Curated annotation (Swiss-Prot):
Entry GO CC: plasma membrane
Record-stated family: Belongs to the peptidase S1C family.
Induction: Induced by heat shock during exponential growth and by heterologous amylases at the transition phase of the growth cycle. Negatively regulates its own expression.
Disruption phenotype: In contrast to other bacteria, in which inactivation of serine protease leads to thermosensitivity, inactivation of HtrB leads to an increased thermotolerance and an increased tolerance to hydrogen peroxide. Inactivation of both HtrA and HtrB leads to growth defects and to thermosensitivity.
Positions of the PDZ domain: 356-440
Protein name per the record: Serine protease Do-like HtrB
Species this protein is from: Bacillus subtilis (strain 168)
Signal peptide location: none
């Protein structure tokens, strides 16, 4: 199934940011390349390209499916760009569009977890029209402006010009003195040379990118607080129940349809989907809703019956024969990431420092004859192609041609499992155990995790 972000720029390909330099363009570092991405990963970029070509309203919402190509040479590090077909990211290229918002009925008594968020429910939430009117000032449209090179004859030089690459939505969650802050999706702002924000009253502000995180697909923007009169209240997504009514407010297909409201229910909780990002394929925990989510909705809020934000709209299934499958990032997952982005401009994560290939991609004869595996050892874990110098993996004693079968006590079947454990269960500075198979023998190694950098793999 193809998952795509609601709003995404056309310019950024979903390749891992830790791509091995000497490899071909479609090769990925193991840390970010998973070949058999369970049900084919959702691609932010796929969504961009689709919404770009799909600017002809709903008809063009059919997801552009990218077929994952399997390389004949299994030794190539994980294929770059396994993109499933059908998940659409809500960025509308050129035309602003980002309406993937659903309403959530989160508990009005949510405990305050951060000073950056307010939690009071809207007093007039019993009437949807009144609630929407109250929330409208907190919803914004976001335009991603990028520079393109004009070189008609390919002779070098030429001129450059700025153009709108894509649009999305966002929600104002904090006002501090003369500044206001907006939550949106990373794929809405990725690659921008300039970001502009359109407020509910039509006023336009130039926005500053405070921080963004590819893995969670979240970003925080800063604008002048001069024209900001209200901030959105956040609810407790852990209190949601399937069947609760929700609404989505956003800008499907651009500012032309700004402030569009759609209604639905929470169709499912704690859904896990694979998403192909510039950091590789990652698993996302999302809320499922049947509220209409169209290109341009990405980054907009999903709102409960109390008028509180319980999710940030991010993805929808765009596949022939499939309707009303939209996904939002739960508010309880959003808040801690936003806190880090406000404080540091980024999210620090641990890494091992290895390039890997899923064992499902390694020929059985190679597993037996070269790696020395046998019996139930065959086909398990991830193959270590290369170990980075001075990395936690090297210091722990991991070697090329080892097969990692457990990390932090959990079974490993794919590189996605490695990332999931690293990003969800562990943090920088943690000590952990790694179980490997080496020439048919099991070894348990100890590693101390360090900070992931732009040039480091998983």
């Amino acid at each position: 199934m193809d998952y795509r972000r609601d709003g995404q720029n056309d310019q950024h390909q979903t390749e891992p940011s830790h791509t091995e330099q000497q490899n071909t363009e479609n090769q990925k570092l193991i840390g970010h390349s998973e070949q058999e991405l369970l049900d084919a990963p959702v691609s932010y970029e796929a969504g961009r390209q689709e919404t770009a070509s799909a600017l002809e309203m709903e008809k063009q919402e059919t997801a552009v499916k990218k077929e994952k190509k399997r390389r004949a040479a299994w030794l190539s590090p994980i294929l770059g760009g396994i993109i499933g077909g059908g998940l659409m990211l809500g960025i509308a290229p050129y035309l602003p569009s980002d309406q993937n918002q659903a309403t959530e009925t989160a508990s009005a008594n949510k405990q305050v977890q951060s000073d950056n968020f307010t939690t009071a429910p809207i007093t007039n939430a019993s009437n949807i029209a009144d609630m929407v009117e109250d929330l409208e000032p907190t919803i914004v449209g976001i335009s991603n402006i990028q520079t393109s090179q004009n070189n008609t004859f390919g002779t070098g030089g030429g001129s450059s010009s700025e153009s709108e690459s894509g649009t999305g939505s966002g929600v104002i969650f904090k006002k501090d003195s003369d500044k206001a802050y907006i939550i949106t999706n990373n794929h809405v702002v990725e690659g921008a040379n300039k970001l502009t924000v359109t407020l509910y009253n039509g006023e336009t502000e130039t926005a500053k990118l405070v921080g963004s995180d590819t893995i969670t697909d979240l970003a925080v923007l800063e604008i002048s607080g001069k024209n900001v009169k209200k901030v959105a209240s956040f609810g407790d997504s852990s209190q949601l129940r399937t069947g609760e009514k929700v609404i989505a407010i956003g800008n499907p297909l651009g500012q032309q349809f700004s402030g569009t409201v759609t209604q639905g229910i929470i169709s499912g909780l704690n859904r896990t989907i694979d998403v192909d990002t510039t950091q590789g394929t990652v698993e996302m925990n999302v809320l499922q809703t049947d509220a209409a989510i169209n290109p341009g909705n990405s980054g907009g809020p999903l709102i409960n019956a109390s008028g509180q934000v319980i999710g940030i709209n991010s993805l929808k299934v765009s596949e022939s024969g499939v309707e009303s499958l939209g996904f939002a990032i739960p508010s309880n997952d959003v808040e801690p990431i936003v806190d880090q982005l406000l404080q540091n401009g980024k999210v620090d994560r641990p890494f091992l420092g290895v390039q890997m290939i899923d064992m499902s991609q390694v020929p059985e004869t190679y597993q037996e004859n070269t790696l020395g595996l046998f019996g139930d050892q065959l086909g398990k874990g991830v193959y270590v192609k290369e170990v980075q110098a001075n990395s936690p993996a090297e210091k722990a004693g991991i070697k090329s041609e080892d097969v990692i079968v457990k990390l932090n006590g959990k079974d490993v079947e794919s590189s996605a499992d490695i990332r999931q454990i690293l990003y969800k269960d562990l943090k920088v500075g943690d000590k952990t155990t790694i179980q490997v198979l080496r020439k048919g023998k099991t070894k348990t190694l100890n590693a101390t995790l360090t900070k992931q950098t732009e040039s480091s793999s998983s």
